[in-house]
Amino acid sequence: YDRKETYIHVNPNDGDEKRDVLYTLGINKSGDFKMYKPCFSAKEILNDGCQDAVMGFVPLIIDYEEFKDGDDIVPYGSRIDKPRQIVGQLKNGDYYILTAKAPGLTFQTSRDLLKKLDVPFAYDLDGGSSTQTTFFDERLTPVYRDVTGRKIPTIMTFEPIEIA
């Protein structure tokens, strides 16, 4: 680990803990999601054409196939029901968000649901206090930690576009 290199997985709010087992979700200039294995540097991700990146946990579905390695990467939360925030992209390029409130879903239950929905790609951002979803002015997920929730340095926004 070269401290001169900026890693997406270093979160200064968590004491600069290097999360070298988590995957990064990149978003390229066309708006397509791209998955990066642990320890890709921010420079490498930018050089690969991504303009944004989000660190959550792990992919659940890649190219329509279940990604089960995440169960061992995140053993403290993968095998028990937990609130989930899952984002993905459909074959036509549309995004989707799957929000599961408490008691939540396991990774496997999430994968089973996503497979039934025939999604090509799904990424678990987290759940509980680490992610919050607001749809227009309505909060879909409750605050699970403190009064205002955990301070999260990353925000993803999805804005509707009009199709002519």
Predicted regions mapped to residue ranges:
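Gly/Ser/Thr/Pro-rich low-complexity, intrinsically disordered segments
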Residues: 1-164
